[in-house]
């Protein structure tokens, strides 16, 4: 139980996949203009990350390793992620058509979000991970992504109404804000040693 809590805290705060490992920067910068869109994408991405972590672990342990096909790991994980995203897209379309329309092109683009493939590959590289720990790591990575995305969207909404100098408007102030946010998360660096 303690190990699972440490994995959660590590993936959410200490080794955040967006701010520390720089995975998932495209949706981080692209979808973070409105908090509603950021919440919707973060929920969908967390769902996909959790399912992809589970499925990729099962594919790795019960298909690729026994058949000595580990060199096909990246291709097989991309297929698993594509299927997971299609499933998520169908679920979101059925449960919340408004959210489906708001997310638009960003929902299918979760397939190409490098955080999803990165978590699957990092889980596969950790030999000590079990099915439960891989699933918890995927879920925690999604929570960490969600936390950062929603916080960044809230800051960008406030910056949009602030008096920002013309040379810093747009992407420049976004990058500065992301950098300061990354520095803030560096404060968690000594919290956990795995």
Swiss-Prot record:
Membrane-crossing segments per the record: 4-24, 39-59, 71-91, 102-122, 131-151, 172-192
EC number: 7.-.-.-
Protein's membrane topology: Multi-pass membrane protein
Domain of life per record: Bacteria
Enzyme type, top EC level: translocase
InterPro entries, per database record: Ion_transpt_RnfA/RsxA, NqrDE/RnfAE, NqrDE/RnfAE_oxidrdctase
BP GO annotations: electron transport chain
Localization: Cell inner membrane
GO CC terms, sorted: plasma membrane
Main location: membrane
Keyword terms, alphabetized: Cell inner membrane, Cell membrane, Electron transport, Membrane, Translocase, Transmembrane, Transmembrane helix, Transport
NADP recorded as keyword: no
Pfam family, one: Rnf-Nqr
NCBIfam families: PRK05151.1 (NF003481), rnfA (TIGR01943)
HAMAP family xrefs: RsxA_RnfA
Family from the record: Belongs to the NqrDE/RnfAE family.
Subunit and partners: The complex is composed of six subunits: RnfA, RnfB, RnfC, RnfD, RnfE and RnfG.
Function of the protein: Part of a membrane-bound complex that couples electron transfer with translocation of ions across the membrane.
The protein, known as: Ion-translocating oxidoreductase complex subunit A
Organism: Ectopseudomonas mendocina (strain ymp) (Pseudomonas mendocina)
């Amino acid at each position: 139980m303690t190990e699972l809590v440490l994995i959660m805290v590590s993936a959410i705060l200490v080794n955040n996949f967006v701010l520390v490992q720089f995975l998932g920067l495209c949706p981080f910068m692209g979808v973070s203009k409105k908090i509603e869109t950021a919440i919707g994408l973060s929920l969908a991405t967390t769902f996909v990350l959790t399912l992809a972590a589970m499925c990729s672990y099962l594919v790795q342990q019960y298909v690729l390793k026994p058949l000595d096909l580990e060199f096909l790991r990246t291709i097989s994980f991309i297929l698993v992620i594509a299927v997971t995203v299609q499933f998520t897209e169908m679920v979101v379309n059925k449960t919340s058509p408004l959210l489906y329309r708001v997310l638009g092109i960003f929902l299918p683009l979760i397939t190409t979000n490098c955080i999803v493939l990165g978590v699957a590959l990092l889980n596969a590289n950790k030999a000590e991970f079990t099915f439960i720990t891989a699933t918890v790591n995927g879920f925690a990575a999604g929570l960490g992504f969600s936390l950062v995305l929603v916080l960044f969207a809230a800051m960008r909404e406030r910056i949009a109404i602030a008096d920002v100098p013309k040379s810093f408007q747009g992407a420049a102030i976004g990058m500065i804000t992301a950098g300061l946010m990354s520095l803030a998360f560096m404060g968690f660096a000594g919290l956990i040693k795995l």
